[in-house]
Amino acid sequence: MAMMAVDDEYTSKTKEAGQRVKDHLLNGGLSNVSYHYQGSVMTDTHIKGHSDIDLLVICNKFYTYDAQNVQQILANNINFSNFQLSKLRTIVGRESYQGNSLEDLRTIRLESENILFWKYDICDLTHPKAIKITNQNLHRDVDIVAASWYDDVDSILNDQKIPYRGIQVYDKVANNISTPDYPFLSIDRINERSANTGGRLKRMIRFLKNVKVDSKNSIGISSFDINAICYNIAPYNYNNLHYLALVEVVYNQLYKIVYDESYANRIVSVDGKEYIFKGNNKRVEIKKLYQDVFTIYSILKTQNLL
């Protein structure tokens, strides 16, 4: 069924494609970087033919942090312990990076391009934020993304441990960095909640992804949005349900998003950093997805499977 995980062999080849890119960059002499993966493969919510793997190449020379909020907290000293405040003061007191951070990121991007261009017949260098290669032996795509570390208050208070750290992606055309993303926090949260619910969260995510790609309509929502839609369903609503019954749970969630704007506006991303539906037209797209799920739900009801 559309909720099932992709088979281990398929997933293994996807990860191997990412590892081969990493090995090429390591052997090519790229320095002062660390490598991390992001995306649906890391949560086992990927679907066949529609999911690649992202290899993050993160500069280790510098990081940035949320100076505005840190300074505000230190000025007001409200709701934080002395121990927490000392961590924030330590960050502020560190010597600032004296190099050119954008030039460092540009070097990572261009050196990565030079290494990979000679390793892959299909190597697309035109995208501002990613190098896109195809491993023709494994039949897998890999996106290679240059980025830097970003620490908000939560990350600093958690000792800049990777699950809490954000990243800022480098754009070679604009020669700047994006607003922070928190892929590792999202990965950890999805994996943890799904483990605590017997894999049901991931089944719902896969189900919606498959409905989207199989739809006759073009549905303009991302995996990021689908993750949030499912993650925001309270676990007590599905924790002990049979897997087929998850269709009704997802149907009810989409119904509320489509017909209750106030409810939709409260849905936040898995990392808790942004609202998914507030101030945009995504609910129009969700209605298309809802209609497809309603069709499946109705069939299951007619067949007395729900």
Question: What are the language-model segments listed below?
Answer:
Residues V33-S34, K129-I131, I226, N265-V268:
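Residue-level recognition of the N-termini of beta-strands and the immediately preceding loop/turn
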